[in-house]
């Protein structure tokens, strides 16, 4: 449905060229909730504005429904933009107008009669759960309610695509969850394609089925959400995953604890990652019964991503080196990814440094 081909965006700042987006190619299918995640300055907001040509690319092609919209006339582009709604971190509501009037403003040139507009606005308010607020003013609403109004306004012209630029960044965690649930509902009920810009991997995990990770204007990794969470390839992606699964907090606690992180001879501190049916397998029991390797679980969790369980364990493996190696080989054959976090030799080196 949306194809971005070799998109680059360059800004001229004084005498310096700044490349905000560098040679990015993405394909977003109809019905996707596609997340684009990255830290501030990664280029994600610039990229999403290319989709509706609020930002024209310096180079590349923008294909929507098999048409290159870069070739559209001004009139054709106006019609195209009606099919693309957009919401932002800041709600941009007109404070002197009621909620009803804020949405009605978007229908000003729709060709609908006053009665038809009234009926449509009532339906939109019902869709976003704000029917009782139609005569209220923005100042009387909470942040979450204001974003619901912004969503209703963005849907006024029956768009096929909804662009969400940091739409939950100004909201508390509970309200964020409610807005994400609403977006997921709209995606399912309206077959709405959603492109979600965020710096929070937790947001992506909640509703996206695909994700691209951006850094310094480039997409460093993209895949379906389960593959990204279960088999991240790039260091930045791994960092984002850890923040969304709280593994980084657990690992920091373990490594900084004087007893938990100290290993004896024939011990290793290891992280296991597994996905899908592997979460139901008694793998830890198998390590002892087959290889006489003891497993001390220091931390574990299971995340549900797109209805697929993804598990993580941080453990201390105990056994002679050959047995541990056989156990790790067995786990690899079962599809479990292993990452050696610390060895006895590293513990010993640290102790020697402390003595010195």
Curated annotation (Swiss-Prot):
- At the top level of its lineage, which domain of life is listed? Bacteria
Q: Which UniProt keywords apply?
A: Amino-acid transport, ATP-binding, Cell membrane, Membrane, Nucleotide-binding, Translocase, Transport
* Residues annotated for ATP binding in this entry: 38-45
Positions in coiled-coil regions: none
User: Which top EC class is named for this enzyme in its record?
Assistant: translocase
Q: Which reaction does it catalyse?
A: L-methionine(out) + ATP + H2O = L-methionine(in) + ADP + phosphate + H(+); D-methionine(out) + ATP + H2O = D-methionine(in) + ADP + phosphate + H(+)
Listed under GO cellular component are: plasma membrane
Please list which residues make up the signal peptide.
none
Q: Name one GO molecular function term.
A: ATP hydrolysis activity
Location of this chain's protein in the cell = Cell membrane
Instruction: Indicate whether RNA-binding appears among the record's keywords.
Output: no
Entry keyword Kinase:
no
Indicate the segments forming the ABC transporter domain, all copies. 2-241
Q: Subunit comment for this entry?
A: The complex is composed of two ATP-binding proteins (MetN), two transmembrane proteins (MetI) and a solute-binding protein (MetQ).
* Function (record text): Part of the ABC transporter complex MetNIQ involved in methionine import. Responsible for energy coupling to the transport system.
Protein family (similarity comment): Belongs to the ABC transporter superfamily. Methionine importer (TC 3.A.1.24) family.
Name of the protein in its database record: Methionine import ATP-binding protein MetN 1
In its UniProt entry, the species of origin is given as Enterococcus faecalis (strain ATCC 700802 / V583)
